Curated annotation (Swiss-Prot):
Belongs to the prefoldin subunit beta family. It is found in: Cytoplasm. This is Prefoldin subunit beta. Heterohexamer of two alpha and four beta subunits.
């Protein structure tokens, strides 16, 4: 790092920050995707039950009884919320990837030896 110009060192620091942000976004995306898959499976399962089926849900540390209609409505809302969150994370990941690519190109250009013209 001693022979690297200060401006390139600063860009390398920024690149490291972007890569850390990207890792966090990817982890969040994986969690949201897992939650979304779980909610969709639960909805599929509940929709196969008769309308008068006894359904229970967890609320904190409690398990409470609910109706099929209410459970379906809550799951659909949860799925919608998770899909919005997933789309936002996808956009965030894309923006960070673009910044990483752009900064990598700048670093490579700055480190490239000047060509004789």
């Amino acid at each position: 790092m001693q022979n690297i110009p200060p401006q390139v060192q600063a860009m390398l620091g920024q690149l490291d920050t972007y890569q850390q942000q990207l890792q966090l976004v990817i982890q969040q995306k994986q969690k949201v995707q897992a939650d979304l898959n779980e909610a969709k499976k639960a909805l599929e399962e509940i929709e196969t039950l008769p309308d008068d089926a006894q359904i229970y849900k967890t609320v904190g540390t409690l398990i409470v009884k609910t109706t099929k209609e209410k459970a379906v409505q809550e799951l659909k809302e949860k799925i919608e919320t998770l899909e919005v969150r997933l789309n936002a994370l996808n956009r965030q990941e894309q923006k960070i990837n673009e910044k990483v690519k752009e900064l990598t190109q700048k670093i490579q250009a700055a480190l490239r030896p000047p060509t004789a013209g």
